[in-house]
Amino acid sequence: MRLIVMGQQAFGKSALEAILEKGEDEVVAVYCAPDKEGKPVDPIKTFAEEKGLPVYQPDNFKDAEYLDAMRALNADLCVMAYVIIFVPEEARDIPTHGSICFHPSILPKHRGPSSINWPIIGGATKSGLTFFWPDDGLDEGEILLQKHIDITPDDTLGTVYFEKIFPLGIEATLEAIALVKAGNPPRIVQDSSLATYESWCRKADAEIDWFKSSADVYNLIRGTNPQPGSWTTHDGNELKVFDCAKVEASGKPGEVVAVSDEGITVATKDGGILVKRVKPHDGKKITSADYISKVSLTAGVVFG
């Protein structure tokens, strides 16, 4: 088939690379977001240009010139590999078989742009990914295929994405294309009664509330590690918190009840969190032991 690959960042680049390596389909063009001044060039653009592929970077898909250029490609399918901008029906339906889109959750659960963060924050033990046929709703189109993963108690946003969803998503990209090529691909209507939606997981969402349970605090820290990064305050300054563990402790919520080479033990509503790695407001990520030494931290200090 003649494919348009639409995507961005590392996942889009790796999906394009996998399609080219398989060598069964012709990539006729690559679409990615416009360049931003002062920002690195998107890796999918760099890779596509290295391979001699046409690259398009429309700021919208409504202008007639962009739509005409897409029609001229005579594509059979558009593969949307990590796309966070809205692509209207007029553009989606230009390829003979339309467009398929990757989403990192088991739809209809966790529609929205931060669909890996929120399941971890909520304490979920399973998640996955979906390829679906996008419509004008947000992640509401018919389902083509789904793949499931386990979320372990030690998983973070980083491990779930880079070690599980990312590689499985690349495999699923090739499988999704093959399903369309084979004819009569699945189109399973999402059960809207099961749908959930969450917006971006932003800095405000990542502030630690030490008055919550140890489980809730622990899940927030790992569900925002590395981005956007959970945080608290110390002496009025922001302190980001990364690697941690649940421990037994007693004290008022937010109180530093112990400091050691292992880290900083902070009391919660029903126990404690051993903070192992932090990022001060004026520096890089460091071990908690280094932070203890840097600021002469002692038990009795209250975070937050």
Model-derived features with residue positions:
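Short, intrinsically disordered/low-complexity patches at protein termini
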Residues: T125, E163, T232, K240-D243, ...
